[in-house]
UniProtKB/Swiss-Prot annotation:
Belongs to the YqgF nuclease family. GO terms for biological process: rRNA 5'-end processing. InterPro entries: RNaseH-like_sf, YqgF, YqgF/RNaseH-like_dom, YqgF/RNaseH-like_dom_sf. It holds the Pfam family RuvX. The keyword Hydrolase applies. One of its GO terms (molecular function) is nuclease activity. Keywords: Cytoplasm, Hydrolase, Nuclease, Ribosome biogenesis. One of its GO terms (cellular component) is cytosol. This is Putative pre-16S rRNA nuclease. It comes from Psychrobacter cryohalolentis (strain ATCC BAA-1226 / DSM 17306 / VKM B-2378 / K5). Could be a nuclease involved in processing of the 5'-end of pre-16S rRNA. It is an enzyme of class 3 (hydrolase). Its EC number is 3.1.-.-.
Length: 173
């Protein structure tokens, strides 16, 4: 005997709820000398420090970065935008924006289904250093905290994902 509650009525025109598929997000704390990385899970809205990449005057090892995106199956990259406290652009924020455009362009060239966006990262480094000190993760003032900053950037993104700005790869330099 078949349970009639399991049979869909052909006159039922309701649309099923869309299934939200969890995906990985890569947060990048952009810098001229180094770039912090964190991986976030869209379902649990949690992030983990991942790595710190060496930068050559603001340029990463593109093959390495794109390889990380491919291997981990990243669906979105969030690049930190270091604005001034009054919200105006800084020299570094202009470079971060240019980096994000270049990244989007390279991702497009690789035919990867990855979205690149920018997210305000004001005070992430200050918060990261404070958290690292409190937890004993660093022992001296100059210890690298870029990956922790990327985690905080990811938390900022999860708190308000609609505040990020999507990057158009067509405008890449």
């Amino acid at each position: 005997m078949v349970d009639s509650t399991l049979i869909k009525d052909s006159t039922d025109t309701s649309v099923a709820e869309p299934v939200i598929k969890p995906h990985l997000i890569l947060a990048l704390d952009y810098g001229v000398k180094k770039m912090g990385m964190a991986l976030g899970n869209s379902l649990t809205e949690t992030a983990r420090a991942f790595d710190i990449l060496a930068m050559n005057n603001g340029q990463p090892d593109w093959d390495n970065l794109l390889g990380i995106i491919k291997v981990w199956g990243v669906a979105k990259v969030v690049v930190g935008l270091p604005l001034n406290m009054d919200g105006s652009s800084s020299m570094l924020s202009k470079r971060a924006h240019k980096f994000a455009r270049r990244l989007a362009h390279r991702i497009m060239e690789q035919h990867l289904p990855v979205i690149v966006s920018l997210c305000d990262e004001r005070l992430t480094s200050v918060a990261a250093r404070e958290i690292a000190w409190e937890n004993g993760w660093i022992k001296h003032e100059r210890a690298p905290i870029d990956d922790i900053s990327a985690c905080i950037l990811m938390s900022t993104y999860f708190a308000d994902p609609h505040s990020s700005i999507a990057i158009d790869a067509i405008k890449a330099d």
